[in-house]
Amino acid sequence: MGKNISLWDHCDPQNHAPQIVAVKLSAKGERSVRQHHPWIFDQNILKTNKTPKAGDVGIIFAYKSNKVIGLGLMDPKSPIAIKMIHFDGGAEINEAFFLDLFKKAIEKRVPLIDKTNAMRLVFGENDGLPGLIVDQYDAVLVVKIYSLMWLPYMALIKEVLLSLCAPKSIVLRANRHVSRALKLEEEDQVVLIYGSLPNPEIEFHEYGVRFLAHVLKGHKTGFFLDHRNNRHRVGQLSHGKRVLDVFAYAGGFGVHALANGAKQVTSIDISAQALSLAEKNAALNEFTGKHETLCGDAFDLLQQQIKKGIQYDVVVIDPPSFANSADGVDLALNKYETLTRLGTQLVAKKGWLILASCSSRVDMDQFLQAHKKGFTAVKTQDFNLIEKTGHDIDHAVGFEHGHYLKTAYYRRK
């Protein structure tokens, strides 16, 4: 049998040299481009001068003239058929073009350097590079692609990253959509494209707290970097306190709590492997408090804790996305309401209830309304909303559909 074709093999520019495609849009599509929205949906494309392939450069012409109003990368198998990379005229898509975009993105993250050595350097559409993520874990970069259109450019992007960041290693990962389209075996969906990686568990720090990220097998690119500020905030609230971390995964909130002097932390997750990683992360740090892990369904375990009359000073509930499509929003809101109802019953007087959502399809107002329903269900008016948070600067949002992370801090009277 021959060698499997890896993700990196598909990135060979000789497989498909990007072509230029002239594009005319509907009035609605053109209005979207003029407003600098990064997405063009397929129904807003009136005509092209040739059949596009993924990665071709679409030159967008004005509806009533031949004036170029922007450039996008063609992604014909996606409902978002063109993803914009340049507005207000034309440009040459070459190494210098990408070097400028990456340089601007990295410069935005400079204020984080004294807080952490792990951050998102490129955040897709929000940095002018739709469907492309670059995360840094110490000296290792992890690039994740969410669209086939990036394949012809990866060799060039690799050189840009080497030039700007001088990493020891670069890992390339594909999301589920790309992996399925390329029919990649699981072991071929992640590939080391530069340097060596003796240990795929990379240690990093944030606000003095140490963690491990598995850059080959961990969720996303290895860790959930977007909650950094919230983890730090929970740590600040946890000194001498009893803390419950629900949907703990690798223990982000709980480890910050322990490192900041929490008396006790209980971490809940359905995955025994995740809880093992949480314990491993905790062990990287000095702490004197007790760390307990509970493996099982969070809803069931919270009910059990309530029946036992257990209460905590800080309760953090950070579930996975419950709404992966528009059809899932109502179910997600019901689950947020249920988690609020359960969480309120576990918070001691003067304690904190911290509720998070990572679903882009649920906005902050809907999220807060679900909390109100949860409070009403247990007939309590004891919780005051103290603070709402969103994205840290390495996950800054540049367009209306980019918001996904929201966290609400409630204090019990």
Annotate the PLM regions.
Residues 271-316:
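S-adenosyl-L-methionine
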Residues 122-135, 151-224, 232:
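Non-catalytic substrate-recognition/targeting regions of SAM-dependent transferases
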Residues 264-269:
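Conserved SAM-binding motif I beta-strand of class I
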Residues 240-249:
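Conserved class I S-adenosyl-L-methionine
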Residues 338, 352-413:
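C-terminal catalytic and target-recognition region of SAM-dependent MTase-like enzymes
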Residues 298-376:
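S-adenosylmethionine
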Residues 1-138:
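Non-catalytic accessory regions of SAM-dependent methyltransferases
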Residues 250-263:
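Conserved SAM-binding loop of SAM-dependent methyltransferases across substrates and taxa
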